[in-house]
């Protein structure tokens, strides 16, 4: 949004409806009666409807007398020879709702569909059965009615129009529920079209073909031409002509396909391709809403390949000079910049100058015509003009027109006006201009950042490596987009809000998004290791100059003979004290122990950002980057073939082989497939430990792995140790050939005792390394498992991207309000307290706690007190009441009082706990710091928390999917896109439905005895699944024997008596007489009793105690007790089971929890399941907001297109997601009003979104805009205007 007011009017709302024939005629300027595709009167391109071509932009419109560029276009109309039904579903709904004789609608406030064959309360007429037949075929779609004891009859559009015309306006107002007068915008008679509007030609412009430049008519123009042609043919025929029926069918087909041709019923006459109707133009990714309204192409943009540049600062972007000279920005002339602008004007870097009266001066290049004659001043010929731009440069050359022979007069040379304050100069980019850098796909906030321009030679866009993680750039040909903001407000927001220093802290999780990578991390690691050998003087001077430059530095900070670790410590803030983990600790800006890694550097940047702000963190990243670059230039580091070798290769190979053999023996002794997988995974882990221990300390690949700059120990193990077990689909490669007996034809069917290693190789165990080389069979298994990661990367990225888009569209209106609540566009409360704490997670050390109490206690204690025993210190606060005084009083004022009391108690408990665990000496300073930190961490009003939630979760899902590509052969866990997609959709039949049931049995009890105790009470199976052979109906003896499968029945502890009881309960005598045999059940029945039908339902008899559970596994829990993991869920049954520990029973089915325990329990369980999928390194506030959004309506609501259709926002916001035409049609048929409250609707209407800087408003008093009359003399005697109000003035809003 620009700072200055626009001359155009703002859209306040949109009224949807269906036009009546009278309204169509009133807005029409011409009746289209000719089917020719030429600019003729009455044709499809009648000039009175506006311009349609690309070459007549300067022609005047006969209707509005504007040029082709300014003419908005004017509608025409077609008088249809026969009525046409466009919206069949809505038409059938109204036919079911009203009486077909008198048109009366029921008296209910929201009438339902009357029962067919019932009598009308007004006239007593019978209501017929109305059906829509062949709804998906536009050639055969029709409405049928059936009277009682009659046959279905097709209801023609003429009869439909007559029936719906009887509906009274008052009934329409009552049915729509939009208040009195709604029938003005919609009446059911308008569902049958008798007069068709014709779009202006500017809405269906001609397209120029390439390469011949011929004009091609738009599909909609061809549709209109065909409709007009058929319509005129019908009018020309007599009503009783036999050809009329076929032409009417064509007219209705082409009219329907004009709106919706997704079935491709109407095709081009030349290329036989389906033509695009209105629905195809509006919906999908390339439609009008998403391609041209929600997102638009714009000027002042650039695109090029992106590359790294370690000399740039974090917030700088290197722009190629060719792009910088092409992009322009308007600048207001002031006394302070007039000299610099005049210099740019002389250098040719100004494109235009706008005077204060609005006149624009722009240089235009004059060129002679191609073929003009060139002569010297004395008349000597020089030939003809072949290169107009080059030949016009010499002013001494005389030009004569090749047409008339007359001398061509050159225009006078262009001269710029003298610059004065108030003018606007459009200049090229200079260093320091703000520009937005973006890389698609824009998954989260850090995919588009505001940078400072730095003009550089070359043709690639360059940026600092520290910001590449947010863009997900790997410089393998990635391209970046540059967007140049034009207005002063847009430039300020780009410079301040979008700056990388303002978004160093990730909006996704508690880590720094902008930090060192690769060479920078490696340099920090190596420098932190070197704490004894001093730097040479040249190296020391180079590093200090690179970091501090000409600003200078205090020589006392870096002593003579400083080591690389001292150099690294000199860059850190002197007040920094942080425990980086892994034995690395920094105290008072000095590295006192350990060494730096990538995670340690991120923790340092995060600590500096939280304590000193984003600017300080950005400067720290710059200094670390420049310091490591300079230091590595003196200490080269490269990896070679020798780094792939261990210190003693033969011994390493032997030790790895021994480890593999021992684990293979464990796999042989395993009872099930899970035990085999655990043993084989242990072989890879043992091989990794052996390989890493055999590497030399200075091995460069190991150094990079320990520094976390590139690679890890897993890669080293695959290179020098072994690849280990390969997995496909979460399990070992199966035996897929030779009837399921072999995995490859190279392996035998039966294994000898000496072929144990080969046996596991046939199931994908690779004991070779890349250094040794894989045999062809191992290569096959490795490629087979690696394919899974590749396919997952290529296919699941689209799945996760669509999931993110669904979350964004349904949560884009969720914004934090000024009262601390989270509300949607309609003002409905989604959360009373954001995240349960009301704090901005990016400003907190932990979830909802913005204070690092340990560091704060050290800072608020003297050095003498710190060195003494901790008993000399005392807690700064001693009670909850005292701690609650440090919480901001205005925290979440819109929440109910009980919620606020709980919130204050929660924060006070955290403060009290921090004070007790970390006592200090200066209590007043401690309290002041805590109060200031809490006040600064309160969530800002207008924060788009819904979009942040969706982007954070979506980016995390996408990153998890991309990571699978780099883990070829590893057992990929299923806590990823598929389960999370099921949670978003709240599938009632998820792929994995299980219950975890802890058992109340002695942990020392053997597993078989536990199964005996449980019996078949945990399962219920169909009788057919338990049979060894399916019997047929006996014809002799009237008996049947059901033979049970002993393996299945023993595993489930289902006895023949249980089967007999279940059969007898469903089919008691005289149906069957049931008796138990050795391991089966015998059925007998009466001789004259028919049992053929009974046998059909016999095999569906349920045997067991818990419906919905097929089987279960017994596992050991973390506490050593027995846990039953079931396949299938029935939470209610397990909560009541005497052997189940009901307090710890868990199920993965959210709907089962909702139906058993209610909404609160389902919400908590949904949060736990989502946290297990994506909660790692993610702010819990995002998941809490998403679960609250899904549970806000009082029942679980999925995140999908059906929920979007029932949202309370306007139809335009809903149509911007999916099913655009259906939603807009429904809005018109229900006379909805779009108030432009949702984010999507405001973007489509050209309004600022109510979030961020567009969230606040301005309240002014009545006299605010009055001319000030009070003049007060200043100290020098000059008068100035006093804009303040006096105390006795009345101030009214």
UniProtKB/Swiss-Prot annotation:
<keyword id="KW-0548">Nucleotidyltransferase</keyword>
<keyword id="KW-0479">Metal-binding</keyword>
<feature type="binding site">
    <location>
        <position position="476"/>
    </location>
    <ligand>
        <name>Mg(2+) 2</name>
    </ligand>
</feature>
<comment type="similarity">
    <text>Belongs to the RNA polymerase beta' chain family.</text>
</comment>
<dbReference type="Pfam" id="PF04998">
    <property type="entry name" value="RNA_pol_Rpb1_5"/>
</dbReference>
<feature type="region of interest" description="Alpha-amanitin binding">
    <location>
        <begin position="724"/>
        <end position="734"/>
    </location>
</feature>
<keyword id="KW-0240">DNA-directed RNA polymerase</keyword>
<keyword id="KW-0804">Transcription</keyword>
<dbReference type="InterPro" id="IPR006592">
    <property type="entry name" value="RNA_pol_N"/>
</dbReference>
<dbReference type="InterPro" id="IPR044893">
    <property type="entry name" value="RNA_pol_Rpb1_clamp_domain"/>
</dbReference>
<comment type="function">
    <text>Component of the DNA-dependent RNA polymerase that catalyzes the transcription of DNA into RNA using the four ribonucleoside triphosphates as substrates. Largest and catalytic component of RNA polymerase II which synthesizes mRNA precursors and many functional non-coding RNAs. Forms the polymerase active center together with the second largest subunit.</text>
</comment>
<dbReference type="InterPro" id="IPR007066">
    <property type="entry name" value="RNA_pol_Rpb1_3"/>
</dbReference>
<dbReference type="GO" id="GO:0046872">
    <property type="term" value="F:metal ion binding"/>
</dbReference>
<feature type="DNA-binding region">
    <location>
        <begin position="270"/>
        <end position="339"/>
    </location>
</feature>
<feature type="binding site">
    <location>
        <position position="474"/>
    </location>
    <ligand>
        <name>Mg(2+) 2</name>
    </ligand>
</feature>
<feature type="compositionally biased region" description="Basic and acidic residues">
    <location>
        <begin position="354"/>
        <end position="376"/>
    </location>
</feature>
<dbReference type="Pfam" id="PF05000">
    <property type="entry name" value="RNA_pol_Rpb1_4"/>
</dbReference>
<dbReference type="InterPro" id="IPR000722">
    <property type="entry name" value="RNA_pol_asu"/>
</dbReference>
<feature type="binding site">
    <location>
        <position position="476"/>
    </location>
    <ligand>
        <name>Mg(2+) 1</name>
    </ligand>
</feature>
<dbReference type="Pfam" id="PF04983">
    <property type="entry name" value="RNA_pol_Rpb1_3"/>
</dbReference>
<dbReference type="InterPro" id="IPR042102">
    <property type="entry name" value="RNA_pol_Rpb1_3_sf"/>
</dbReference>
<keyword id="KW-0862">Zinc</keyword>
<dbReference type="InterPro" id="IPR038120">
    <property type="entry name" value="Rpb1_funnel_sf"/>
</dbReference>
<feature type="binding site">
    <location>
        <position position="99"/>
    </location>
    <ligand>
        <name>Zn(2+) 2</name>
    </ligand>
</feature>
<feature type="binding site">
    <location>
        <position position="123"/>
    </location>
    <ligand>
        <name>Zn(2+) 2</name>
    </ligand>
</feature>
<dbReference type="GO" id="GO:0003677">
    <property type="term" value="F:DNA binding"/>
</dbReference>
<feature type="binding site">
    <location>
        <position position="64"/>
    </location>
    <ligand>
        <name>Zn(2+) 1</name>
    </ligand>
</feature>
<dbReference type="GO" id="GO:0000428">
    <property type="term" value="C:DNA-directed RNA polymerase complex"/>
</dbReference>
<dbReference type="GO" id="GO:0003899">
    <property type="term" value="F:DNA-directed RNA polymerase activity"/>
</dbReference>
<keyword id="KW-0238">DNA-binding</keyword>
<keyword id="KW-0808">Transferase</keyword>
<protein>
    <recommendedName>
        <fullName>Putative DNA-directed RNA polymerase 008R</fullName>
        <ecNumber>2.7.7.6</ecNumber>
    </recommendedName>
</protein>
<dbReference type="InterPro" id="IPR007083">
    <property type="entry name" value="RNA_pol_Rpb1_4"/>
</dbReference>
<feature type="region of interest" description="Bridging helix">
    <location>
        <begin position="776"/>
        <end position="788"/>
    </location>
</feature>
<feature type="binding site">
    <location>
        <position position="102"/>
    </location>
    <ligand>
        <name>Zn(2+) 2</name>
    </ligand>
</feature>
<dbReference type="GO" id="GO:0006351">
    <property type="term" value="P:DNA-templated transcription"/>
</dbReference>
<dbReference type="InterPro" id="IPR007080">
    <property type="entry name" value="RNA_pol_Rpb1_1"/>
</dbReference>
<feature type="binding site">
    <location>
        <position position="74"/>
    </location>
    <ligand>
        <name>Zn(2+) 1</name>
    </ligand>
</feature>
<feature type="binding site">
    <location>
        <position position="71"/>
    </location>
    <ligand>
        <name>Zn(2+) 1</name>
    </ligand>
</feature>
<feature type="binding site">
    <location>
        <position position="61"/>
    </location>
    <ligand>
        <name>Zn(2+) 1</name>
    </ligand>
</feature>
<feature type="region of interest" description="Disordered">
    <location>
        <begin position="354"/>
        <end position="390"/>
    </location>
</feature>
<dbReference type="Pfam" id="PF00623">
    <property type="entry name" value="RNA_pol_Rpb1_2"/>
</dbReference>
């Amino acid at each position: 949004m620009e700072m200055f007011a626009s001359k155009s009017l703002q859209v306040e709302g949109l009224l949807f409806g269906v036009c009546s024939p009278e309204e169509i005629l009133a807005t029409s300027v011409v009746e289209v009666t000719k089917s020719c595709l030429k600019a003729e009167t009455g044709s499809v391109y009648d000039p009175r409807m506006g311009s349609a071509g690309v070459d007549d932009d300067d022609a005047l419109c006969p209707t509005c007398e504007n040029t082709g560029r300014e003419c908005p276009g004017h509608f025409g109309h077609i008088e249809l020879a026969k009525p046409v039904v466009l919206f069949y579903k809505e038409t059938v709904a109204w036919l079911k709702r009203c009486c077909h004789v008198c048109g009366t609608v029921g008296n209910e406030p929201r009438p339902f569909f009357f029962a067919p064959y019932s009598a009308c309360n007004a006239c007593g007429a019978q209501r017929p059965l109305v059906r829509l037949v062949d709804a998906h075929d536009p050639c055969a779609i029709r409405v049928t009615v059936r009277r009682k004891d009659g046959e279905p009859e097709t209801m023609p559009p003429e009869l439909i129009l007559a029936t719906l015309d009887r509906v009274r306006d008052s009934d329409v107002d009552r049915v729509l529920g939009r208040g009195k007068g709604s029938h003005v915008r919609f009446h059911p008679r308008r569902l049958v079209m008798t007069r068709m509007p014709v779009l202006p030609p500017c809405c269906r412009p001609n397209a120029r073909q390439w390469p011949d430049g011929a004009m091609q008519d738009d599909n909609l123009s061809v549709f209109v031409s065909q409709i007009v042609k058929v319509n005129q043919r019908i009018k020309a025929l007599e009503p009783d002509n036999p050809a009329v029926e076929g032409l009417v069918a064509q007219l209705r087909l082409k009219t329907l396909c004009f709106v919706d041709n997704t079935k491709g019923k109407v095709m081009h006459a030349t290329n036989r391709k389906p033509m695009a109707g209105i629905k195809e133009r509006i919906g999908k990714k390339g439609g009008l809403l998403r391609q041209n309204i929600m997102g638009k192409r714009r000027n002042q943009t650039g695109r090029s390949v992106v590359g790294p540049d370690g000399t740039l600062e974090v917030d700088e972007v290197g722009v190629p000079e060719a792009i910088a000279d092409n992009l322009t920005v308007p600048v207001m002339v002031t006394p302070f910049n007039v000299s610099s602008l005049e210099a740019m004007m002389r250098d040719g870097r100004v494109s235009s100058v706008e005077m204060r009266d609005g006149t624009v001066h722009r240089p235009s290049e004059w060129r002679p015509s191609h073929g003009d004659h060139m002569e010297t001043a004395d008349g000597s010929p020089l030939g003809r003009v072949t290169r107009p731009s080059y030949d016009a440069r010499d002013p001494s050359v005389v030009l004569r027109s090749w047409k008339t022979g007359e001398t061509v007069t050159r225009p006078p040379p262009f001269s710029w006006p003298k610059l004065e304050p108030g003018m606007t100069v459009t200049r090229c980019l200079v260093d320091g201009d703000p520009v937005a850098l973006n890389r698609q796909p824009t998954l989260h906030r850090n995919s588009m950042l505001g940078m400072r321009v730095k003009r550089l030679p070359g043709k690639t866009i360059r940026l600092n490596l520290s910001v590449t993680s947010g863009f997900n750039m790997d410089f393998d040909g990635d391209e970046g987009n540059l967007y140049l903001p034009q207005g002063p407000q847009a430039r300020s927001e780009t410079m301040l809000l979008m700056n990388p220093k303002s978004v160093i802290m990730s909006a996704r999780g508690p880590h720094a998004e902008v930090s060192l990578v690769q060479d920078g991390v490696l340099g920090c690691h190596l420098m932190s290791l070197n704490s004894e050998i001093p730097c040479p003087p040249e190296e020391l001077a180079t590093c200090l100059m690179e970091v501090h430059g000409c600003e200078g530095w205090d020589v006392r900070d870096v002593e003579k003979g400083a080591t690389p670790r001292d150099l690294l410590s000199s860059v850190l803030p002197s007040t920094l004290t942080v425990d980086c983990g892994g034995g690395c600790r920094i105290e008072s800006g000095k590295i006192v122990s350990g060494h730096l890694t990538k995670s340690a550097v991120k923790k340092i940047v995060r600590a500096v950002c939280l304590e000193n702000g984003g600017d300080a963190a950005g400067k720290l990243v710059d200094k670390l980057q420049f310091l490591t670059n300079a230091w590595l230039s003196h200490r080269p580091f490269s990896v070679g073939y020798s780094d792939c070798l261990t210190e003693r290769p033969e011994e390493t190979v032997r030790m790895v082989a021994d480890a593999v053999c021992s684990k293979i023996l464990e796999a042989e002794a395993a009872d099930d497939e899970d035990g085999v997988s655990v043993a084989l995974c242990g072989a890879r882990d043992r091989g990794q430990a052996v390989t890493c221990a055999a590497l030399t300390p200075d091995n460069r690949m190991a150094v990079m792995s320990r520094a976390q700059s590139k690679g890890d120990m897993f890669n080293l193990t695959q290179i020098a140790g072994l690849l280990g077990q390969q997995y496909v689909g979460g399990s070992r490669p199966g035996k897929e050939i030779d009837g399921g007996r072999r995995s490859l034809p190279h392996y035998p069917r039966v294994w000898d005792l000496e072929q144990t290693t080969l046996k596991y190789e046939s199931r994908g165990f690779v004991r070779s390394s890349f250094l040794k080389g894989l045999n062809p069979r191992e290569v096959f298994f490795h490629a087979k498992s690696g394919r899974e990661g590749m396919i997952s990367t290529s296919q699941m990225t689209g799945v996760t991207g669509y999931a993110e888009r669904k979350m964004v569209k349904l949560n884009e209106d969720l914004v934090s309000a000024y009262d601390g609540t989270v509300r949607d566009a309609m003002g409905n409360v989604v959360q009373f307290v954001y995240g349960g704490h009301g704090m901005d997670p990016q400003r907190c050390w932990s979830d909802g706690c913005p204070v690092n109490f340990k560091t704060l206690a050290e800072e608020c204690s003297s050095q003498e007190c710190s060195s003494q025993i901790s008993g000399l210190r005392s807690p700064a606060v001693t009670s909850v009441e005292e701690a609650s005084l440090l919480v901001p009083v205005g925290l979440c004022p819109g929440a109910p009082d009980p919620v606020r009391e709980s919130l204050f108690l929660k924060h006070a408990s955290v403060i009290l706990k921090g004070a007790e665990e970390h006592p200090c000496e200066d209590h007043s300073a401690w309290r002041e710091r805590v109060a200031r930190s809490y006040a600064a961490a309160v969530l800002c009003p207008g924060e788009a928390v819904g979009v942040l939630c969706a982007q954070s979760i979506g980016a995390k899902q996408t990153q998890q999917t991309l990571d699978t590509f780099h883990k070829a052969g590893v057992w990929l866990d299923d806590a990823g896109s598929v389960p999370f997609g099921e949670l978003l959709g709240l599938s009632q039949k998820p792929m994995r439905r299980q219950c975890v049931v802890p058992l109340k049995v002695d942990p020392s009890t053997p597993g078989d005895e536990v199964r005996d105790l449980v019996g078949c009470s945990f399962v219920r199976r169909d009788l057919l699944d338990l049979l060894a052979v399916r019997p047929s109906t006996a014809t002799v003896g009237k008996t049947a024997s059901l033979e049970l499968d002993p393996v299945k029945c023993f595993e489930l502890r289902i006895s023949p008596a249980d089967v007999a009881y279940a059969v007898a309960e469903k089919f008691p005598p005289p149906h069957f007489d049931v008796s138990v045999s050795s391991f089966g059940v015998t059925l007998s029945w009466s001789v004259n009793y028919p049992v053929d039908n009974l046998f059909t339902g016999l095999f569906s008899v349920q045997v067991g105690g818990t419906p919905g559970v097929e089987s279960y596994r017994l596992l050991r829990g973390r506490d050593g007790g027995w846990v039953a993991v079931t396949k299938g869920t029935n939470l209610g049954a397990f909560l009541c089971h005497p052997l189940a520990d009901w307090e710890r029973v868990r199920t993965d089915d959210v709907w089962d929890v909702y139906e058993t325990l209610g909404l609160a329990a389902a919400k908590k369980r949904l949060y736990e399941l989502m946290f297990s999928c994506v909660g790692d390194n993610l702010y819990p506030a995002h998941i809490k907001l998403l679960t609250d959004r899904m549970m806000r309506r009082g029942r679980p609501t999925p995140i999908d297109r059906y929920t979007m259709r029932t949202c309370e926002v306007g139809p335009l916001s809903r149509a911007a997601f999916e099913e655009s035409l259906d939603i807009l049609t429904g809005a018109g048929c229900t006379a909805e009003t779009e108030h432009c409250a949702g984010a999507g609707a405001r973007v489509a209407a050209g309004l600022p979104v109510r979030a961020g800087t567009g969230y606040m408003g301005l309240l002014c008093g009545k006299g605010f805009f009055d001319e000030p009359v009070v003049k007060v003399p200043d100290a020098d005697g000059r008068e100035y205007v006093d804009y303040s109000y006096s105390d006795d003035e009345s101030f009214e809003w």
